[in-house]
């Protein structure tokens, strides 16, 4: 999957989960902004697994690696 497809899928998942369009600010800290919380993180990981086949055990989830849309896209791309 090319990076643009990964980005579009991640942004779509984030919008579905949070109701927020974060595409305008790819460096926004989703946790500090109150857009994503721990439950949202689990839902995000499940959706990434369902839609992209990415498996990240919750025990290996490092919040600092997943805190912005840009970091999420990069992390997903690195796991494919």
Curated annotation (Swiss-Prot):
GO MF annotations, alphabetized: D-alanyl carrier activity
Compartments where located: Cytoplasm
Domain of life of the source: Bacteria
Modifications made to the protein after synthesis: 4'-phosphopantetheine is transferred from CoA to a specific serine of apo-DCP.
Keyword Transport (UniProt): no
UniProt xrefs under SUPFAM superfamilies: ACP-like
Pfam family, one: PP-binding
Keyword Transport tagged: no
Pathway connected to this protein: Cell wall biogenesis; lipoteichoic acid biosynthesis
Protein task: Carrier protein involved in the D-alanylation of lipoteichoic acid (LTA). The loading of thioester-linked D-alanine onto DltC is catalyzed by D-alanine--D-alanyl carrier protein ligase DltA. The DltC-carried D-alanyl group is further transferred to cell membrane phosphatidylglycerol (PG) by forming an ester bond, probably catalyzed by DltD. D-alanylation of LTA plays an important role in modulating the properties of the cell wall in Gram-positive bacteria, influencing the net charge of the cell wall.
PROSITE patterns reported in the protein's UniProt record: CARRIER
Record's protein name: D-alanyl carrier protein 2
Modified residues (O-(pantetheine 4'-phosphoryl)serine): 38
Stated family: Belongs to the DltC family.
CC per GO annotation: cytoplasm
GO BP annotations, alphabetical order: cell wall organization; lipoteichoic acid biosynthetic process
Keyword annotations: Cell wall biogenesis/degradation, Cytoplasm, Phosphopantetheine, Phosphoprotein
UniProt organism field: Lactiplantibacillus plantarum (strain ATCC BAA-793 / NCIMB 8826 / WCFS1) (Lactobacillus plantarum)
Residue ranges occupied by any Carrier domain in the UniProt entry: 1-80
